[in-house]
């Protein structure tokens, strides 16, 4: 599949012009929303994206440690280690991180959605959530494959335990439900405990 050059994608990002006492100032739309403490986690979860999200979380904490941060998620998932860097930072910083699923939150995206502050995790009505076990595909010597298999089993157990804590579901239920791809509607995700509510309009 042909991928558009980054310069083309950047050109498609809208700019917002504000009038200030010193004249006009322009921001790309994401930078302007960052001023409102809104962060977008969109696309594959990987190291570069994780570094950007972590940096934004730390910046907003330094700006105002007592104000909530709003993390909007539309992601098919991705790297567990990159996702855990974001997750750990969400738990580490002082501000509550409110998570909102727009579109989809699958795999590590769903884990980050569930990792938001208690009572502040939301889905929009037509979003989809999917949980499953970590994926692994390894090649090489048998001993190396065995090492990787052991590692992924350890990660699976850790993620399941953490998901049980965030959802309130028994660990054995999480283990059963993540054995294969498990898709949920926004309402089902709320009933399961992955989010606290489904919101159609701002209050």
Curated annotation (Swiss-Prot):
Entry's EC annotation = 3.4.21.92
This protein's source sits in the domain of life called Bacteria
Q: Which InterPro entries match?
A: ClpP, ClpP/crotonase-like_dom_sf, ClpP/TepA, ClpP_His_AS, ClpP_Ser_AS
Q: Which positions carry the signal peptide feature in this UniProt record?
A: none
SUPFAM superfamilies (UniProt xref): ClpP/crotonase
Reactions performed catalytically: Hydrolysis of proteins to small peptides in the presence of ATP and magnesium. alpha-casein is the usual test substrate. In the absence of ATP, only oligopeptides shorter than five residues are hydrolyzed (such as succinyl-Leu-Tyr-|-NHMec, and Leu-Tyr-Leu-|-Tyr-Trp, in which cleavage of the -Tyr-|-Leu- and -Tyr-|-Trp bonds also occurs)
Q: Which GO terms describe its molecular function?
A: ATP-dependent peptidase activity; ATPase binding; serine-type endopeptidase activity
Keywords from the UniProt entry:
Cytoplasm, Hydrolase, Protease, Serine protease
Where is the catalytic site? 107 (nucleophile), 132
Repeat found in the keyword field? no
GO biological process terms, alphabetically, are: protein quality control for misfolded or incompletely synthesized proteins
State whether keyword Protease applies.
Answer: yes
Give the EC class as a word: hydrolase
One Pfam short name = CLP_protease
Annotated GO CC locations? cytoplasm; endopeptidase Clp complex
Alphabetized PANTHER family for the sequence: ATP-DEPENDENT CLP PROTEASE PROTEOLYTIC SUBUNIT (PTHR10381:SF70)
Task: Report the protein's function.
Answer: Cleaves peptides in various proteins in a process that requires ATP hydrolysis. Has a chymotrypsin-like activity. Plays a major role in the degradation of misfolded proteins.
**Subunit details for this protein?**
Fourteen ClpP subunits assemble into 2 heptameric rings which stack back to back to give a disk-like structure with a central cavity, resembling the structure of eukaryotic proteasomes.
UniProt lists the family membership as follows:
Belongs to the peptidase S14 family.
Q: What is this protein called?
A: ATP-dependent Clp protease proteolytic subunit
Q: Which gene encodes it?
A: clpP
């Amino acid at each position: 599949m042909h991928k558009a050059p980054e310069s083309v994608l950047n050109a498609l990002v809208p700019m917002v012009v504000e009038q200030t006492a010193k004249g006009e100032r322009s921001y790309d739309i994401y930078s302007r929303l960052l001023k409102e403490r809104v962060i977008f986690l969109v696309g594959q979860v990987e190291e570069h994206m994780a570094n950007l999200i972590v940096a934004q979380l730390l910046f907003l904490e330094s700006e105002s440690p007592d104000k909530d941060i709003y993390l909007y998620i539309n992601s098919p998932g991705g790297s567990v280690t990159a996702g855990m860097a974001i997750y750990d930072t969400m738990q580490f910083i002082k501000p509550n991180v409110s998570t909102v699923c727009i579109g989809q939150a699958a795999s590590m995206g769903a884990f980050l959605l569930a990792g938001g502050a208690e009572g502040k995790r939301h889905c929009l009505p037509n979003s989809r959530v999917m949980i499953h076990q970590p994926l692994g595909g390894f090649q090489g010597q048998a001993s190396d494959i065995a090492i990787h298999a052991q590692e992924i089993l350890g990660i699976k157990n850790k993620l399941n335990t953490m998901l049980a804590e965030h959802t309130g579901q028994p660990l054995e239920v999480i283990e059963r439900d993540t054995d294969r791809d498990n898709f949920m509607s926004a309402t089902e995700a709320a009933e399961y405990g992955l989010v606290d509510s489904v919101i159609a309009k701002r209050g």
